[in-house]
């Protein structure tokens, strides 16, 4: 008997069926004579994430290259027609119990490419809520069904990288605001939000695409595959992402409950590198109030580039960093940052805020959210500390606790051509509160805050901010990660 382990699995997802079941039946439900279908992809609401005021365009090129080009070429067009048609018809018969000749699949295979045109906002630019970020339409009248057949694949591939890039952008903007208020310069900003999310993401692909979204605004990451993803689908002449040596609880506990020699051991392992040490495996406050003073001279003797970064990983996020005035001990009343100031000292910057000695620092990464980050930054400012004294390890609470509904992403058909006549179509449910109302007709994005709808294929769209990036199986406009980051930087 053959073992399942003996099967060579190239791909489990059938390229002609990268959709919801009901999509396979819509082809025969459209009006007779249908030729062209045009749809928009739009973030409709930020009600579930009101801090996301700007929605960053990101992930389109990677999606196109990975799926619309490579996946279809490798798993559909490069195989025999009989094989891909049989694969489709057998699956439909076995699951829906419907006879489907698969003629449309055969016709697509014979054509040899996806007859689709996609326009999108340049990656790295950000739009306001309700501004379309992408349009999709078929270019061959025999394949009107293909436009919205791809809806499911587009949504599942794009909502998360766009949402994560938008979150990273919002974090960076907020960190910039606190830096402008409390710091002399902004050199710390590219590293102040560090991606810790990989282990909490839903899949490796989620970690790659979301992690790449984080990297549009930051350089600090522990999600290694995100860097490889950017290299593969965008490329860059500059540093994409980086990290530093760091310990984890297994390391600390393996050395025993007396963590003073463990701190010293790790510092000796990395005498010339910045080093992050998780400090709460046994007794966080003992490490801060007893062990760090004993290590003070050794830490100060290290090169400035070999800063020791203290990482708390439990307790109340605010009181650990900023202190609790009701606590029973002085160190708990002060919090980590003030304790580090008492031990190592620092300087007062030109804006009157305290900056820790450059040999010591702190990172907090336990369940960080936007709201927690802001509260910590406000707490430090109130205590007279510059925002640069803290780095945030941003994990799955930030990047995985989202859905397509976080920004209300949807693809809706807004124009159809039947027997040569184009007409605007739309969705406007009377039972809806306005969220699900779609545009009408073709659209043109006139600014990153506004658009015009009600247009036809005959209207002048030469000034449309939506640019053609994919047409008839080819990527027709390429961007790189440096350009994306430049677009991002221009909006800070």
What are these regions (language model features)?
Residues 2-49, 101-102, 106-115, 119-350, ...:
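Buried, small/hydrophobic-residue-enriched core segments of structured protein domains
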Residues 20, 78-81, 101, 143, ...:
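Helix N-terminus capping/helix-initiation residues
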Residues 75-111:
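Short beta-strand/loop turn elements enriched in aromatics
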Residues 91-94, 152, 199, 412, ...:
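Generic signature of intrinsically disordered, low-complexity segments enriched in small/polar residues
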Residues 2-72, 216-219, 223-224, 229, ...:
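Gly/Ser/Thr/Ala-enriched C-terminal appendages of enzymes
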């Amino acid at each position: 008997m053959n073992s399942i382990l003996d099967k060579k699995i190239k791909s489990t997802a059938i390229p002609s069926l990268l959709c919801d079941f009901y999509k396979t039946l819509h082809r025969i439900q459209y009006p007779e004579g249908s030729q062209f279908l045009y749809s928009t992809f739009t973030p409709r609401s930020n009600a579930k994430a009101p801090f996301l005021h700007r929605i960053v365009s990101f992930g389109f090129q990677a999606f196109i290259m990975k799926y619309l080009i490579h996946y279809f070429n490798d798993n559909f067009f490069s195989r025999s027609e009989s094989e891909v048609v049989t694969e489709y018809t057998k699956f439909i018969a076995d699951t829906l119990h419907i006879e489907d000749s698969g003629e449309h699949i055969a016709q697509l295979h014979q054509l040899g490419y996806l007859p689709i045109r996609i326009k999108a906002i340049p990656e790295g630019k950000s739009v306001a809520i309700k501004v379309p970020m992408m349009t999709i339409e078929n270019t061959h009248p025999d394949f009107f069904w293909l436009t919205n057949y791809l809806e499911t694949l587009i949504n599942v591939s794009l909502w998360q990288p766009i949402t994560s890039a938008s979150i990273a952008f919002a974090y960076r903007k907020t960190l910039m605001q606190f830096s402008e208020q409390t710091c002399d310069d902004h050199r710390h900003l590219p590293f102040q939000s560090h991606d810790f999310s990989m282990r909490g993401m839903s899949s490796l692909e989620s970690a790659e695409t979301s992690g790449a979204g984080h990297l549009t605004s930051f350089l600090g990451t522990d999600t290694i595959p995100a860097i490889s993803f950017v290299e593969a689908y965008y490329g860059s002449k500059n540093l994409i992402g980086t990290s530093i040596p760091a310990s984890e609880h297994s390391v600390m506990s393996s050395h025993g409950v007396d963590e003073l020699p463990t701190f010293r051991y790790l510092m000796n392992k990395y005498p010339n590198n910045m080093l992050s040490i998780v400090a709460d495996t046994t007794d966080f406050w003992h490490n801060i109030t007893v062990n760090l003073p004993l290590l003070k001279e050794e830490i100060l003797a290290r090169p400035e580039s070999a800063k020791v970064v203290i990482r708390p990983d439990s307790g109340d996020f605010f009181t650990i960093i900023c202190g609790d005035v009701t606590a029973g001990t002085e160190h708990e009343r002060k919090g980590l940052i003030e304790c580090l100031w008492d031990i190592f000292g620092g300087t007062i910057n030109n804006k009157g805020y305290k900056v820790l000695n450059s040999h010591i620092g702190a990172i907090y990464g336990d369940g960080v959210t936007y709201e927690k980050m802001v509260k910590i930054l406000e707490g430090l400012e109130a205590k007279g500390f510059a925002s640069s004294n803290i780095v945030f390890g941003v994990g799955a609470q930030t990047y995985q606790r989202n859905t397509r509904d976080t920004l209300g992403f949807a693809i809706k058909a807004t124009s159809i051509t039947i027997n040569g006549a184009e007409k605007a179509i739309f969705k406007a449910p009377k039972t809806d509160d306005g969220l699900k109302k779609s545009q009408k007709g073709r659209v043109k994005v006139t600014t990153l805050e506004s658009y015009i709808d009600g247009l036809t294929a005959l209207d002048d769209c030469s000034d449309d901010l939506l640019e053609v990036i994919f047409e008839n199986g080819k990527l027709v406009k390429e961007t790189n990660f440096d350009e994306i980051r430049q677009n991002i930087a221009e909006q800070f």
